Structure formats: C-alpha cells, structure tokens
Amino acid sequence: MSKRLTLNFFVILIACLIWFTPVVWVISLSFQPNELLQKTTTNFLFGFFPIPFTVENYIKMWSSSFDVWVMNSLIVAICATFFTTIFCSMAGYAFARIDFFGRKFIYPLVLAGLMIPGELLFIPLFTQFSNLGLNNSHVGLFLPKLAIPFGVFIMTQYFKGVPKEVEEASIIDGANRLQIFFKIMLPLAIPALFTVAIVNFGGAWNDYVWPLVSASETNMRTLQVGMSLQLGNRLGMYMGTSLAGIIISTMPTIFLLVYFQKYLLRGFAIGTK
C-alpha cells in the first residue's frame, strides 16, 4: 500500500470515528434507565456501556402520543413526496421538451425560488391557510412542500439528457404527449425520480418550523414538534426516553439513504451537468 493510500485511509478512519462516536454514544444511552442517566450524564465514557441494559425508554416513548406523531409525519412526508415527484417530473418535462411561450423566462424564475428562504413565506401562507380552513390539517401540513424548485431543476436536467430520437420514434408509432411522458420518459427517469423523492421525503419528515406554526392541536403534531414540545422541557428527567425517540425518528431517512444510495448519487450527478 502506497503512502498516499495509507494517508487517505487514516484520514477517512479519523473522519468516521469523529462521526460515529456521538452516534454510538446516543444509541447506547437510549438503552439505559432515565434514573441512572440523571446521575451519570457528565461521564462521557459511561455512555458507551449500557449497563444495566433496558428497552424501557422505547416502551415509554411508544406508550405516549408517539404513534400519533409518527403517523402524522408519515402522512405528511408520503403525500408531499408523492405529489411533489409527479408535479416536478411534469414541470421538468415541460421545461426540457415543450417549446411553449415564456419558457425561457419562467424557468429561471422557478430556479430563483432556491434563493428564497421558506420561512420568509410563512406569514402569507399561514394567513391564506387560515382563510381556507387548512390549518390543523394534514393537507395544510404538506401542501406548502409541493413547490420545490430543486425537484424541477433535477428533472429538467435529466430530461434534457434523454435523446430526442426516443420521443421521435414514439411519435412515429402513434404515441401522444401523455403516453410518451408516462410510458417512455418516466421509466427512463427513475434515478432522478428517486433523488427528488428521497430529498423531499427527508425534508418533509424532518421539517419542524412549518408544522409548529400550522398545527396548534395536539393530535396534529408531527414527530419533531411533538418530541420538542412534550419532552424538550423535561430532557433532564427523561433523557433516555428522548434519545430513544431521536433514534426512532432518524431511522426512515437513514434507511432511504442507504437503500437508494445509488439512485441518489446518479440523480445528483445528472443535476450537475
């Protein structure tokens, strides 16, 4: 092994240790009793040895309103991901393939949305949703997440890379625009679709500020909001329970990133072209 490879290996090893050490520590603490954690949280090394080992924290978390929060987060994240993927793919196909009036003006305008913080729109969104009666509802939670300029950009770049001969051959065979889009272009755009879906699911699942503003009723809280409001003020008393909830809340996004990693990387690579 050359010196350069050895140096790269040790750099990567150190980076992995820096990243994994707090993760392993948090996982270990989540399997320790709350009463014990109140006395020993200042001892860093103690956290790596879950003795006595217990799953009581996970049971307590599920016995509260945790299942309601998880269900709300799943509904919001799945609905936002499904509709955003459809709308972004349609918009991307239109910008990449259809020569309509104003396309060269509208597309940069859409991309300009990447530079606008979402929090800047909370007041007008909250006012409009209040007038429409959409606050404290699942629709009101996921509807603002449907306008994603990033997804439109990824899909547009991907469709631009598909040879036009594919569409021309389909037109010769008698296919119309919708048939070309759903039967030809969408199957070819699976990597880009997965990229948009994973990024949007993670954003919707981890979103905190908008659900906090939009949903004031307890039964409409998402996972992040519920954990913050119910356990945040009692972190010292229920540290193990809080950490158990944190571990559970991160599992869906970690699973998606690991399982669909190859699609995600391909989609990002295409978006940089």
Residue positions per predicted region:
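A structural signal for multi-pass alpha-helical bundles of membrane permease subunits
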Residues: 4-273
